[in-house]
Amino acid sequence: MSGAGNREQVFPTRMTLGVMKSKLKGAQQGHSLLKRKSEALTKRFRDITQRIDDAKRKMGRVMQTAAFSLAEVQYATGDNISYQVQESVQKARFTVKAKQENVSGVFLPTFDSHINEDVNDFKLTALARGGQQVQKAKLIYSKAVETLVELASLQTAFIILDEVIKITNRRVNAIEHVIIPRTENTIAYINGELDEMDREEFYRLKKVQEKKQEAAAAAEQEEALAKAKAEGATDELAIQQDVEALDIKADKEEVDILQEKEDDVIF
């Protein structure tokens, strides 16, 4: 049993062979599906990687502009504008909604930002001076937050896809290099054992047939000998009967001769 460690420990029967063939077919189909899934995820992963790179570049430019804008606001207002902004906020103008996107069976969380144009709690902020700079900073920071939300969504998807792709590739490699070869070796082992059993069965049936033929030939030979003995006994009986008949006939002829002699003596 060479290579017994590279196959499953099963009893070689035709039922087991059918089970192993079904398992091999399932493994091949699973390998094909996982391979396509890995390719689809890898394609999406590369797209997300490119988008993350673009978003980071955009984020750098936006945050630089926002920093200059905030400096302009502080220069124009001349006081602590952040305190006024915090006191002016009554309702959330900027909201973030989360949803899930299905990519080849993998659910990726995505974040969408929404701006409620009906809410404007900063219209009276810095009304005395610096109002224009405040509105400009508000727009720039709104774009910065949108970019941050987009970047957070992309990076979350990046982390999840990276882990899922690694797991999928490990499964693909395990099926390709372990499960399928082991199942094929098991099928080859079962086929070899079944062929060996078929040859043994054929040899056994051949021997049984030869024994039957020898027994039939011996029976025919015994029957022929018995028949020959019976025929020989019949011939001996017939010869003996013929001999006895000849003896009786000879005795009768001798008696007749003696009687004739006696008749001649009387005359």
Swiss-Prot record:
InterPro entries registered for this protein in UniProt: V_ATPase_D
Predominant location category: membrane
Any Gene Ontology CC annotation: fungal-type vacuole membrane
Disulphides: none
Compartment(s) of residence: Vacuole membrane
Gene3D superfamilies referenced in this protein's UniProt entry, alphabetically: 1.10.287.3240
Pfam families cross-referenced by the UniProt entry: ATP-synt_D
Recorded GO MF terms: proton-transporting ATPase activity, rotational mechanism
Keywords: Hydrogen ion transport, Ion transport, Membrane, Transport, Vacuole
Its membrane topology: Peripheral membrane protein
GO biological process, one term: vacuolar acidification
Family: Belongs to the V-ATPase D subunit family.
Summary of subunit composition and partner proteins: V-ATPase is a heteromultimeric enzyme composed of a peripheral catalytic V1 complex (components A to H) attached to an integral membrane V0 proton pore complex (components: a, c, c', c'', d, e, f and VOA1).
PANTHER family: V-TYPE ATP SYNTHASE SUBUNIT D
NCBIfam families linked to this entry: V_ATPase_subD
Function, in words: Subunit of the V1 complex of vacuolar(H+)-ATPase (V-ATPase), a multisubunit enzyme composed of a peripheral complex (V1) that hydrolyzes ATP and a membrane integral complex (V0) that translocates protons. V-ATPase is responsible for acidifying and maintaining the pH of intracellular compartments.
Protein name in UniProt: V-type proton ATPase subunit D
Organism: Candida albicans (strain SC5314 / ATCC MYA-2876) (Yeast)
Lineage, broadest ranks: Eukaryota, Fungi, Dikarya, Ascomycota, Saccharomycotina
Name of the coding gene: VMA8
